[in-house]
């Protein structure tokens, strides 16, 4: 059983020459993306397409961006990632619509065994990460293998997300935990007790 098959079926695998050859082609495309964005956005998106990344419209990664394969990533529409986004996509990473990443957000689908002898044998693994719709992940957050983040979620800056997060909550911390529910009462406010002015509020309610 070859290691590309093992990797793609969520089995323990070793990064042999065949695996590394796939990464090499992606690194070329991502290097070009980081060089041309934001000055030549159409060319930049062509670079992402070369990796095999599946994405809808209005997808943007502020450079520098890093991923290992690209072909394992699916991104919904209206996605924005600030600088230094890292996706270790040794398997599937799925991101919904209307998702925002702060700077230095990392999705670590990859991992290694905890026992030293198993780890030293060079085996690694990848477990899927899923992020729902209407999610904002604050700066310097890490999302670890196997995590599912629900819809309409805010993850506070600096969080390490080790477990699933349900829909409609604010969560933060290391390890990340639910702080409170998000309700309709939050809609008129943009920060703590600061309300939107009339012009901004009217624009929000146009939709």
Predicted regions and their residues:
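Terminal amphipathic alpha-helical/low-complexity segments used for targeting or macromolecular assembly
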Residues: 1-58, 176-207
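Short secondary-structure boundary/capping segments
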Residues: 4-5, 51, 121, 128, ...
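Short arginine-rich
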Residues: 34-35, 164-168
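Short-chain dehydrogenase/reductase
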Residues: 60, 100, 136, 154, ...
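Flexible, glycine/small-residue-enriched loop-and-beta-strand segment within the central core
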Residues: 65-75, 80-149, 174-175, 181-191
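Conserved catalytic segment of ABC-fold P-loop ATPases
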Residues: 150-153, 166-168
């Amino acid at each position: 059983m070859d290691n590309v098959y093992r990797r793609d079926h969520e089995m323990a695998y070793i990064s042999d020459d065949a695996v590394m050859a796939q990464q090499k082609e992606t690194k070329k495309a991502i290097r070009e993306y980081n060089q041309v964005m934001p000055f030549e956005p159409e060319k930049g998106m062509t670079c992402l397409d070369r990796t095999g990344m599946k994405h809808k419209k209005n997808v943007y990664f502020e450079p520098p961006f890093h991923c290992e394969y690209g072909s394992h990533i699916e991104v919904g529409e209206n996605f924005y990632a600030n600088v230094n986004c890292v996706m270790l996509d040794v398997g599937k990473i799925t991101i919904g619509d209307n998702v925002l990443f702060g700077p230095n957000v990392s999705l670590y689908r990859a991992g290694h065994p905890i026992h030293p002898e198993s780890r030293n044998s060079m085996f690694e693994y990848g477990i899927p990460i899923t992020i729902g719709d209407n999610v904002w992940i604050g700066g310097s957050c890490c999302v670890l293998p196997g995590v599912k983040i629900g819809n309409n979620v805010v993850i506070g800056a600096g969080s390490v997300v080790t477990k699933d997060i349900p829909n409609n909550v604010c969560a933060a911390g290391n390890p990340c935990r639910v702080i409170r529910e998000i309700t309709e009462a939050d809609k008129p406010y943009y920060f703590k007790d600061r309300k939107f002015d009339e012009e901004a509020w009217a624009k929000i309610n146009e939709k």
